[in-house]
Amino acid sequence: MAAPLAQLRDRFQAALAASFGPEWAATDPLLVPATNPKFGDYQSNVAMSLAKQLGQPPRAIAETLVQNLNLADLCEPPAIAGPGFINFTLQPSYLVAQLQQLQTDERLGIQPVSPPQRVIVDFSSPNIAKEMHVGHLRSTIIGDSIARVLEFQGHEVLRLNHVGDWGTQFGMLIAFLQEQYPQALSQPDALDISDLVAFYKQAKARFDEDPSFQETARQRVVDLQSGEATARQAWQLLCDQSRREFQKIYDRLDIQLEERGESFYNPYLPAIVEDLRRLGLLVEDQGAQCVFLEGFQNKEGQPLPLIVQKSDGGYNYATTDLAALRYRLGQDQAQRIIYVTDSGQANHFAQVFQVAQRAGWLPAAAQIEHVPFGLVQGEDGKKLKTRAGDTVRLRDLLDEAVDRARTDLTTRIAAEERSETPEFIEAVAQAVGLGAVKYADLSQNRNSNYIFSFDKMLALQGNTAPYLLYAYVRIQGIARKGGIDFAQLDPVAAVLTEPTERSLAKQVLQLGEVLDEVARDLLPNRLCSYLFELSQTFNQFYDRCPILNAEEPQRTSRLLLCDLTARTLKLGLSLLGISVLERM
């Protein structure tokens, strides 16, 4: 079942072809939801945009289009306003018919795409021997939500975790541990991940000031790269330990990922450099092999190259990213690749993509996209830090969110003189705390920095996860109070006599349009905005329309609207990685 906007767009494009010739059939009709209910449900200003090309007044163009629009089953007769705006109001009979289809459709009328794409979403990507911090939060949950939406649409999605599991830092850490704490390199879990981080800092300080230790560390890198057994075993232990810690976070956040770290691409790196050399793209600059690109300059205005092989013959992130991109397009047969990282890497990926383009590695139809995001800031507007000035550990942040949600809940239970089991309290605290953290991030435009505030994200009012969860809980409460099993309600024609009934019905039908936007523009905040507006509209409907005490057929019709709203909220929140609750 196509969403209203999609159906309207198809009819509009047919009218464009009928009005001005088949060459205009692919013209974007510029349809958007109406800014004010008095203008109907949707508006188009395509007549203004075509005036110059067609050499006609916008209003004349609008009149011609309206004459050729076949909308009798979908809309009231379109109205032309002002210089040539075309306003559309959906027919009540159309809304009723669409709602009836949704009642028995588990996917709420959203058909899988055809044909589906093979999509890779590269997200999270923490570094071995380092703890996940608040900076990993955004990549992890933005990437997960994008993957969930694309999967629901029917695309074949490969979720990749490009873990930082290779590099000279391992030689430094292994050398230090062999000297200071050798059992860490032979016994699993001899150290906690936080101990590893502390040892890494000590190793780095030692490396910076001790030339003999520098030499030892470099030798460990050579050992590791050559496959020497002791070095490889030590590296594997460090990776396994970090991986287990990462998985605890992923399990807690319900994140599915397939790890394919930097080391996976090591065998492919020499061919990257050789192929770029063969293609005549490499230039030697101060001993390093580089590709100079258009549009990239340093602060002094000099050309800024992408280095693909260092002067000592070693490789770097750019080499690995080029190898990964070529592997994903070749062996994985990806048609769309999405990289979810902080905005500070935007130039790096722009350079990598341009090199791949110049090398001829990008198929014409391939979509390669960098999805950047801004910083998480404290309430002082600066990068979020602990009081000691350290980076906030992700596990500590999640713990605090759950603790605060638990405190809020127990306070509310006491005020309401309710009695709840410890299991109930814990389940609600986990769902609300973790859901609040996810939603607070996803509800922001990812391109912006945002201020992290526990108080705001856990509030029961406003654009928050608790507000949306409470709307769902309120609907389940209606069912419990009335002894209603929504699944057993007989499908009936909705009765949309009240304005809030119509508004709610129309919003329920818009989920497919919103998901299309999210999949196209990779902006999960649009789904958040939709769910927030749906919750607001439901609460207005709840306040103004009796439900359990209404006469038939309004009673059943309103119960069905409640059920469709709850199902839409549940589905939408699941695509954000947030679980609903029956009570809270």
From Swiss-Prot:
InterPro entries: aa-tRNA-synth_I_CS, Arg-tRNA-ligase, Arg-tRNA-synth_N, Arg-tRNA-synth_N_sf, ArgRS_core, DALR_anticod-bd, Rossmann-like_a/b/a_fold, tRNAsynth_Ia_anticodon-bd. The keyword Protein biosynthesis applies. Its EC number is 6.1.1.19. Keywords: Aminoacyl-tRNA synthetase, ATP-binding, Cytoplasm, Ligase, Nucleotide-binding, Protein biosynthesis. It is found in: Cytoplasm. It catalyses: tRNA(Arg) + L-arginine + ATP = L-arginyl-tRNA(Arg) + AMP + diphosphate. One of its GO terms (biological process) is arginyl-tRNA aminoacylation. Pfam families: Arg_tRNA_synt_N (PF03485), DALR_1 (PF05746), tRNA-synt_1d (PF00750). One of its GO terms (cellular component) is cytoplasm. GO terms for molecular function: arginine-tRNA ligase activity; ATP binding. A motif ('HIGH' region) lies at residues 126-136. Its main location: cytoplasm. PROSITE patterns: AA_TRNA_LIGASE_I. It is an enzyme of class 6 (ligase). Belongs to the class-I aminoacyl-tRNA synthetase family. Monomer. This is Arginine--tRNA ligase.
